Amino acid sequence: MIPGEIQVAAGDIELNSGRETVSVSVANHGDRPVQVGSHYHFYEVNDALVFDRAPTLGFRLDIPAGTAVRFEPGQARTVQLVAYAGKREVYGFQGKVMGALEGRA
């Protein structure tokens, strides 16, 4: 082994295996592109993105960490979201939650 070398086991890596997911249709009604990062709380994304927000509470994009999805002006697409895990508490972003996700409607 070389110092710093990473040895990966054979096979595929499944991201977010067994986690709750939801698909949502999103349209950018703004005049500028909107980019959403992999771990951004989708419920709180830019208001120029038009979609049914209620089902997205506690969800983020189901994409690899460190990546993003870009919505060009006038563009519509369907994205898959995955539920947050762990303590399921959300702080920051636009400040719409600021605490536990459980018990919210």
Curated annotation (Swiss-Prot):
Query: Which reaction does this chain catalyze?
Result: urea + 2 H2O + H(+) = hydrogencarbonate + 2 NH4(+)
Cytoplasm as UniProt keyword: yes
An MF annotation (GO) of this entry: urease activity
The EC number(s) this enzyme carries: 3.5.1.5
Domain of life per record: Bacteria
Alphabetically, which GO biological process terms does the record hold?
urea catabolic process
A Pfam family the protein falls into? Urease_beta
Pathway(s) the chain acts in? Nitrogen metabolism; urea degradation; CO(2) and NH(3) from urea (urease route): step 1/1
Q: Where in the cell is it found?
A: Cytoplasm
Which keywords does this Swiss-Prot/TrEMBL entry list?
Cytoplasm, Hydrolase
Q: What class of enzyme is it?
A: hydrolase
Provide GO CC annotations from the record: urease complex
**Similarity annotation:** Belongs to the urease beta subunit family.
The UniProt subunit note reads as follows: Heterotrimer of UreA (gamma), UreB (beta) and UreC (alpha) subunits. Three heterotrimers associate to form the active enzyme.
Which PANTHER family does the record cross-reference, listed alphabetically?
A: UREASE
Record-given protein name: Urease subunit beta
**What is the primary gene name for this protein?**
ureB
